[in-house]
Amino acid sequence: MPREVILVDSQLGNLDSVEHALIQVGASVHITADPDRVATARMVVFPGQGSFGATTQAIVDGAMGAALRMVVERGDPFLGICLGMQMLFDQSDENGGNAGLGVLPGQVKRFPTDMPAGEQPGARMLKVPHVGWNDVQPTNEHFYFTHSYYVVPGQAEDVMWWCRYGRVEFPATVARGNVFGCQFHPEKSQWSGLRFLRSFILGGRG
């Protein structure tokens, strides 16, 4: 029997590709923007694209933020994707500083713009945002990223997989108890992304 997953519609990005990927790995997906429906969910996926700002602050301070915290505190499996992962943390420097949900300790900071692509003199500077395929450790699999900001975790043990962009090493995935997050887009990461989602759906973890 397919596992029911609540996919949160928080106006933070296109849900279609995430929904399709979840269906591919055997989930029964229900999209909702209703905090009451989210609060009673037994498995939640919280995707997001874009930036911290007025929309994310309204989520954090409002009924949806309370519903998301309720799922976490009850112990049901919860996955944040991209901005949805970043929002699990305490605070972001983006747009003058905005609070996150405070589920995990840590800050969200912008990639520096002065990172050379190599060690040779005159090497080109890496572009921000970080867009494209990159490998994660220790799995050595490749996933698709698109982000200008990254998490600086308050506790290194919350990090499951790491990724490197220039001189910055950042969490590709985080995990604590029933809470999981991925900075990459599993729905855009082909078979590696589907395997990650299938592992979450089947076992409540990434």
Residue locations for each model-derived region?
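C-terminal and late-domain segments of enzyme folds
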Residues: V151-G206
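Beta-strand-turn-beta hairpins that frame and shape the catalytic cleft
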Residues: R3, N140-E141, A175-F180
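Histidine-centered divalent metal-coordination motifs
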Residues: C82, H147, H185
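Short, glycine/acidic-enriched loop or turn micro-motifs at the edges of active sites
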Residues: L12, M85, Y150, K188
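Pocket-forming structural segment of enzyme catalytic cores
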Residues: Q91-R167
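N-terminal beta1-alpha1 cap of cysteine-dependent amidohydrolase-like domains
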Residues: M1-D76, L83, Q107-D114, S192-G206
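Glycine-rich nucleophile elbow surrounding the catalytic serine of serine-hydrolase chemistry
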Residues: C82, Q86-L88
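Active-site-proximal beta-strand elements of phosphoester/diester hydrolases
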Residues: D9, F143-F145, F180-F184
